[in-house]
Amino acid sequence: MASNVTNKTDPRSMNSRVFIGNLNTLVVKKSDVEAIFSKYGKIVGCSVHKGFAFVQYVNERNARAAVAGEDGRMIAGQVLDINLAAEPKVNRGKAGVKRSAAEMYGSVTEHPSPSPLLSSSFDLDYDFQRDYYDRMYSYPARVPPPPPIARAVVPSKRQRVSGNTSRRGKSGFNSKSGQRGSSKSGKLKGDDLQAIKKELTQIKQKVDSLLENLEKIEKEQSKQAVEMKNDKSEEEQSSSSVKKDETNVKMESEGGADDSAEEGDLLDDDDNEDRGDDQLELIKDDEKEAEEGEDDRDSANGEDDS
């Protein structure tokens, strides 16, 4: 169900508001009004008063369609008097102008008319409400700008205009002012769109710069990772070469020890051989001396025998 707010005074709301007069509010309720007028567009507000009602649409096109489709329709034995709230009809709200269903369509048997007292009081109340509506929602025409001071204003005789013509001119001016207001709101919307577009462009530039910074950071990180990997491989190669050098040094030291041991063994063998030769010579000398001693003994014994 729509809200009860139908008293906004901005031009857009006024141009999209429908006034429903000569409404039998004793029978017709707010839900009935919404059901009848919702087929012309979305209803954002609906208020039902004694003898009349207001329906607030989203835009002026829906309101004009509702006025064209429902004006003069008979509901609950009464003919509706419908128009835009910003464009009141000429001579409305005057006593004796309203037409009942019996006047337009003859006697209506299925909907008996109320008692004379009730009918007269209802008409008076309706007239009062319509006059109140005229006073509340009559918008004075815009005052034109004053003429320049330098130019003299020459009074001109104008023909007197009738009240009907003035009301028509006034209503026409109101519709024109509504159109100006709508064009102004369209211009404001265009300015808002331009501002939004500018903000979006700035946001896009910021996002692009952030993306560029992220790409630079990623490149630097990948470069640092490659450098760290190269340094690590160089360290591994240097450590492996150091280990290899240490292994070679160790092997060389072990080989030198083996050579020295072999040389020592060879020297020991030479010493042993020299010692063996000396012992053999000593043995030979001893044997030679022993033989010479025996020869001396033999010679001595031979002399004794002779």
Curated annotation (Swiss-Prot):
Keywords, alphabetical: Acetylation, Coiled coil, Disease variant, Intellectual disability, Isopeptide bond, mRNA processing, mRNA splicing, Nucleus, Phosphoprotein, Ribonucleoprotein, RNA-binding, Spliceosome, Ubl conjugation
Taxonomy, superkingdom: Eukaryota
Cross-link (Glycyl lysine isopeptide (Lys-Gly) (interchain with G-Cter in SUMO)): K250
Low complexity: compositionally biased ranges: 175-185
Cross-link (Glycyl lysine isopeptide (Lys-Gly) (interchain with G-Cter in SUMO1)): K232
Chief site of localization: nucleus
Disulphides: none
Consequence when changing V108I: In MRD74; uncertain significance
Acidic residues: compositionally biased ranges: 255-276, 288-306
Organism in which the protein naturally occurs: Homo sapiens
Covalent link location (Glycyl lysine isopeptide (Lys-Gly) (interchain with G-Cter in SUMO2)): K8, K50, K89, K94, K176, K223, K229, K232, K243, K244, K250
Effect of R99Q: In MRD74; uncertain significance
Protein name stated in the entry: Heterogeneous nuclear ribonucleoproteins C1/C2
GO cellular component terms given for this protein: actin cytoskeleton; catalytic step 2 spliceosome; chromatin; cytosol; extracellular exosome; extracellular region; membrane; nucleoplasm
Tagged with keyword Calcium: no
Residue span, RRM domain: 16-87
Composition bias, Basic and acidic residues: 221-232, 242-253, 277-287
Modified residues (N-acetylalanine): A2
Annotated motif Nuclear localization signal, positions: 155-161
Subcellular location(s) of the protein: Nucleus
Listed InterPro entries: hnRNP_C, Nucleotide-bd_a/b_plait_sf, RBD_domain_sf, RRM_dom, RRM_HNRPC/RALY_subfam
Clinical disorder: Intellectual developmental disorder, autosomal dominant 74: An autosomal dominant disorder characterized by global developmental delay, including delay of motor skills and speech delay, intellectual disability, behavioral abnormalities, and subtle facial dysmorphology.
Alphabetical list of Gene3D superfamilies matching this protein: 3.30.70.330
Known function: Binds pre-mRNA and nucleates the assembly of 40S hnRNP particles. Interacts with poly-U tracts in the 3'-UTR or 5'-UTR of mRNA and modulates the stability and the level of translation of bound mRNA molecules. Single HNRNPC tetramers bind 230-240 nucleotides. Trimers of HNRNPC tetramers bind 700 nucleotides. May play a role in the early steps of spliceosome assembly and pre-mRNA splicing.
A GO BP entry: chromatin remodeling
